[in-house]
């Protein structure tokens, strides 16, 4: 009934979202510091630090740091087009074969970006670099 396919659309979108925030830098005490970025919830990172079996071992978090995670997927009816509308695509393996495909179904992906900073000025520098990308 169904033909197997995997276009990696979700994976590519998650990577593109992370690329927006990769390489942010802040200025601290006259030197430029790169802000590390991780994929996954902040709570998981903090829980891993707290579950250290050696209680005498000092642990430290490198601050500032950012993390992001994919939190949800919802259908977006406002971008829906007619379900019978089709478009033609060429087969990537053989450029001569033309296939018809139905219009894709619109979904909205939700992400959460967390920023952990020791100083308020560090957080403001990060936010000021992020906000111009969004309306």
Label every PLM stretch briefly:
Residues 1-29, 77, 89-135:
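Charged, amphipathic alpha-helical segments and their flanking helix caps
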């Amino acid at each position: 009934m169904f033909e197997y396919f995997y276009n990696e659309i979700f994976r590519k979108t998650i990577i593109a979202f992370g690329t927006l925030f990769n390489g942010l830098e802040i200025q601290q005490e006259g030197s430029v510091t790169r802000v590390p970025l991780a994929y996954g919830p902040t709570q998981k990172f903090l829980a891993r630090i707290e579950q250290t079996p050696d209680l005498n071992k000092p642990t430290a978090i490198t601050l500032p740091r950012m993390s992001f995670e994919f939190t949800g997927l919802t259908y977006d009816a406002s971008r829906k087009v007619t379900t019978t509308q089709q478009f033609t695509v060429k087969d990537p393996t053989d450029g001569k074969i033309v296939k018809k495909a139905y219009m894709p179904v619109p979904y909205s992906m939700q992400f959460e970006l967390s920023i952990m900073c020791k100083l308020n000025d560090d957080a403001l520098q990060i936010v000021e670099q992020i906000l111009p990308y969004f309306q």
